[in-house]
Amino acid sequence: MKKNNSPQKNNSCSRRKFLSSLGAAAGIAMLPFSKSGGLLANSINDNLGYEAKVAVTEADYYSRELIRNKVQHLFESLGGISDVINTSDKVAVKINLTGGSNTRNNSRLKGADVRDTVWTHPEVLRAVCELLIDYGITAKNIFIVEALWDQASFDNFGYKEITNDLGMQFIDLNKPDPYPDFINIPTGENKFYYESFIMNPILNEVDCFISIPKMKHHYSAGATHSIKNQIGAVPLSKYNMNGQFGHRASLHNEGGDQSTHLPHSIADLYLARPLNLAINDGVKNCINAEGPWVQGYENAEYGILLASKDAIALDTISTYQMGGDPEGSTLELPNGNSCLNYLQMLANLGYGTNKMSEIELVGDGVDAIVSVKPAQKKVMPTGFSLSQNYPNPFNPSTTLLYDVPVTERVIIKIVDIKGQEVETLINSIQSTGSYEITWRADRHASGVYFCTMQAGEFIDTVKIMLTK
């Protein structure tokens, strides 16, 4: 995983300036690591060995102007989106409104807005769709889609207003409307369990399928991002069991053990209808569960937005950011058990990459991505701690271990003997766990350095020695 953190002096611009850049961008041949030429610019991967690009930006709150500018920056950092969408295309945008309108009353939210912590935030939806329209997509050819738990979740929380304001259409995937009936969309010869899925025909008709999930842990699937969001692409009535409306029990349990069958279902849904573009909402979110109906749920604020044309790569970085191991054969569940890793399954079939070394990070938020991995500890930490680095002295890299007992923003920096900041290794929200981080000091001179960790009221420092 390489971070392209070229400085972005100003990632906000006026609507007029942005629109004027669209006409010029198509004729600009951009070099790698440069600021992109606008939404119409072609994606450039060059021969750098990367299989995918994930754009990252930071945002701490959901103001309309901020989110609009941030999503625009994501698209530009990807080199534009003209390689996945044309102005004449029909586009489906899948949101996540899991749990329905009554979720807002759950005590585990602790007063938080359900749109902030559990659902796709309406301002992220608005920003994506406004940019699509600015790009040239006809508004009536944009379809907001979701299999609703109840109509109120769409009508009363801003999603209907956005759809109407922009002149788009909404389709409830629980129903065949506006078509006469559902259709079966095949998964193909690489299926894991299902040969086809019953779906609204709109998912077969659109040229571009976009997923805008909420960045979350999942109690049964480990992580839920853009690909897991597709569980909500099939009608509830066709995949429940024993009349359990609201829960697609057959997708969880029909094939036997849930830790195997649910990942198979998720992967098969992607085979039936792959994504063309994904934007992950992690400005505010939740950890340890996908919703407050699960014991252990906690509100969180990761403060980031991510986007990619490779949904597997996007979910890989998102899973990694939330403390998971996206490269393994299994994903850890919040209760300590594990399930099959559907990212690995799809990557093995060539639908994208879940290898960190094959993913280039771009955008002005790459430093928010945690350059750490979970340490192999079985006991959850009881207090914050920062351990001495090893090896020490070192050249050119060294590893530090640290513990996070509760969800908290963790800041880890390297400073020199004069107290001058050399590098920020971490500045992001992290969930409970033990972690290890590696610092590469190739660019720095020999000498004494200090690594400082701050988390809430906790502050600690260790002395480290670089010898060359």
Locate the predicted segments by residue.
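N-terminal and secondary-structure boundary signal
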Residues: 2-370
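Short beta-strand edge segments in extracellular beta-sheet folds
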Residues: 465-468
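Glycine-centered coil/turn sites that cap beta-strands in beta-rich domains
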Residues: 371-390, 394-413, 436-442
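Short, surface-exposed loop/turn motifs with a glycine/proline- and acidic-biased composition
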Residues: 426-461
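Ser/Thr-centric signal marking residues that sit
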Residues: 120, 398, 424, 461
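Short, glycine-anchored, charge-dense loop/turn motifs used at functional sites
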Residues: 415-422, 449
